[in-house]
Amino acid sequence: MKFAQIIEFTTQRIDEFNAGLDEWMARSEGHRIPHRAVLRRDRDAQDRYLLMVEFASHEQGMENSGRPETGQFAAFLAGISDSSLTFRNLDVLREEDL
């Protein structure tokens, strides 16, 4: 079963976020576990973002969470966030391309 993690955060430093994500992508090149990541911004709260990361399975998501580069990125994200991070772990029950 596919698995997704959502990280909700607020920041006024989105350019730093993007640079940090680019750095994580470079460090994990060749052994990256997630197969898709999408950053979304809340239209009603311009500094609120949701990073949605998709995995082939829950086990792969947990393996990714335990990797040093992922821990470093989470610490970086906490450092540039204006509030505490909210993590959601989701099983993908249905997926359709519309």
Region annotations inferred by a language model:
Residues 1-68, 78-98:
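Short S/T/G/P-rich N-terminal loop/turn motif that feeds into the first structured element of a domain
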Residues 74-76:
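Helix-adjacent hinge/juxtasegments
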